[in-house]
Amino acid sequence: MHHPGPPRFVATGDEVELAPRDPDPTATYTWRLTQAPAQSTVSLGDDPVEHFVPDAPGRYVVRLTAPDGEHDLTVRAFPGTLESSGTHTSGRSGGHSGGVSGGRSGPGRSGSGEYTQAGDGSDGGGGGQPRLTLRPDIEGDEAVVRADCSPHPEGTETAADLAVEFLLDDRDDVDADAVTRDGTALRIPLDALPERARIHAVAVGNHGYSVPDAVEFTRGGDGVETVTSGAGVAARRPYDAPAWAEDSVIYEIYVRTFAGERDESPFDAITDRLDYLDSLGVDAIWLTPVLQNDHAPHGYNITDFFEIASDLGTRADYERFIEAAHDRGFKVLFDLVCNHSARTHPYFESAVEGPDADYREWYEWRSDTEPETYFEWEHIANFNFDHLPVRRHLLDAVAQWADLVDGFRCDMAWAVPNGFWREIHDYCKDRDSEFLLLDETIPYIPDFQAGLFDMHFDSTTYAALRQVGGGGDAEAILGAIEGRAEIGFPEHASFMLYAENHDETRYIVDYGREAAEAAAGALFTLPGAPLLYAGQEFGQRGRRDDLAWDHADETLQSFVSDLASARHDQPALSADADLVRIPYEVRDGPSDRVVAYARTTENDAAVVVLNFGSEPTTVGLPAGTDGTDLVSGEYRGAAGDGDATVTVDSVSVFPADENDLRQ
């Protein structure tokens, strides 16, 4: 179906990309407005991909005429004085919830995020964006959606000050007259439910509106969160990350150097190390790009989106690796590059010949011979997503690789139109609701939670870890985590935590062994899925060099494995556990090199102490904290002054009584 997707929530002045889904490049697609606020003067052009900018608050309905019929899309525009969570981001995808890519500066690369004190994303503390999570249920003969609203953490509003605006999905045949709304709840009689019904909403305050959320009801479906009724209706939350992903230990492999000095094909080398990765505690494996490219070792300059790189092997070799990984219970992530191709791609080599050349419209251009790109990268050229053949080509590639793997790590996600990611999200989720979409966006963008991606690179915590490693106050990492809510991420958002990757200098090189251990401890004990970059676990010093397997630091290796075990074994360290600030006293060593915090669930609690300093530290913790370290298994208690006193080298996790933590 060519329908352009879910309704959009935007502010006036925001740009909405209008594009047919599953496009046929040879077909005709036209757009027209069928409803707009009385004061609006906006109009649409004649292109198959249009860029629509609401100019007045209110509701718009845009109609697409396509080969399979007519499709309506609702766009709800709020006054431009209201801010969405995208307002304080920069770069190509920094618009609001319905926004499209725009601008040319782009966010930074993986390591260029700069940590600032949490709260800087608000409007000064008086308002800011609220947050929203929708809860679906079946009550008697009704499908019910309840909205849990939270005001901005630093704002003056309360939950009672917030309104909720619901929109039915234009793709579903729901009788609007049968729907009732009661404050923060929406109800649909079960006998009025079609085969599929999707409901979208935002929370609206005096200063902003939230990241949209959605729920879905299906008849006879297999939703992730299912409630059974006599009518056989299933309910799910389509914007949640897959359950397997939230607590996965993700392992990034730089494909061409993983084997080290062994004379072995890359896929065979990785397969041979699967038992090692299992013993390390890894759950998911992310390979850097494996497609045919311009021979740059990183693989991000693609020359064929449908073929495995010849220096890595064949498609059959790749599939054998995936099968072996799946047999051992690993998930496999494919590094998906959509923003650009290499300049040695045959289509670009044709396009650059002149303004009338074949494939000229496939790319964006600065001049007759110079394509658009970012950061003056000279080996790539940005695709033109207004050209339907580009979208078709990339969607076909997505379909080919999605059938093999368990998720996509989406390269330069900020540089690709939001609407295109929404289409990929819906395509992947419709075929497998447990498929993962992980975005590389620096800095992260809260609106990307709204049906674009399931999990986000936590570049803010990354930057805080780097600042702490360089001598900053260790409590900065708590501010970084709390900052997620303060810039608008809802409570159901998921994150990937990292201290290094293929774009960054190794943490151990910049800050030393002790700080590297503490940073690893942060990854495994803070809310989010921890990422290990291959070699990080044994002290590899080169960023993209051959892995020095024969010189691995086995003590560090064992330490990281113990961290992974603690993460898997302790419910209080799970992604869903609360992060709680606690009182603590550093009694030996520099106090700003140490941070302590608690993780709690309804039935479990643990206290974490991280020491970024070069010497062991003694710390006083709340009474009720057990001195047995859940990472090492050693008793770390020491004589104290009536509280729990412990000695910590770099990382320790202690069982605790939640009732004592908040006193």
From Swiss-Prot:
UniProt-annotated site: Transition state stabilizer, residues: 503
Hydrolase recorded as keyword: yes
Means of activity regulation: Stable and active over a broad range of NaCl concentrations (0.5 to 4.2 M NaCl), with maximal activity at 2.6 M NaCl. 83% and 94% of the maximum activity at 0.6 and 4.2 M NaCl, respectively. Active and stable also in KCl.
SMART domains hit by this protein: Aamy
Primary localization class, coarse: cytoplasm
Enzyme Commission number: 3.2.1.1
Cellular location(s): Cytoplasm
Segments of this protein annotated with the region Disordered: 1-28, 80-135
Active-site residues annotated for this sequence: 411 (nucleophile), 440 (proton donor)
Any Gene Ontology CC annotation: cytoplasm
Function: Alpha-amylase that cleaves starch into oligosaccharides, the first step in starch degradation. Endo-acting enzyme which prefers a linear polysaccharide to branched polysaccharides hydrolyzing alpha-1,4 glucosidic bonds efficiently. Also has transglycosylation activity, but does not act on alpha-1,6 bonds. Higher activities of 100%, 79% and 67.8% against amylose, soluble starch and amylopectin, respectively. Lower activity of 22% against glycogen and faint or no activity against alpha-, beta- and gamma-cyclodextrin.
This protein's name: Alpha-amylase MalA
Organism for this UniProt entry: Haloarcula japonica (strain ATCC 49778 / DSM 6131 / JCM 7785 / NBRC 101032 / NCIMB 13157 / TR-1)
Phylogenetic classification of the source organism: Archaea, Methanobacteriati, Methanobacteriota, Stenosarchaea group, Halobacteria
